[in-house]
């Protein structure tokens, strides 16, 4: 079911970390995908006894380095990307979107950014059964609008 959403695309901001500990921000319409494909992860995952999700690192042959994931579903998507010949780069949690959505400021850290031959691909990993939840549907709708306004997939 499509969600109608109002997003102020002109003021949407992308925040990223060029290196661990640093933070930079840019209007989304002015951000360079090349800069984001070199970004450090926005956050790192935590391990603790009894945690419900499955975090870890995966050695990616595409990246020639470890790539983090926060769930088994993210790991499955990471594996698919690593074996997809069109994917040239894989960056975990590369940036945070901040935008005015439905007259309220919202933030979201995307799961992955893939550099492909056809351009950047933003990946948010969501279990299929959660897509009917109104909050998840809204999140996916407004992030999709920003991504598409940049000419990305």
Language-model features and meaning:
Residues 1-153:
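Electrostatic, structured charged patches in enzyme active sites and in nucleic-acid/phosphate-binding
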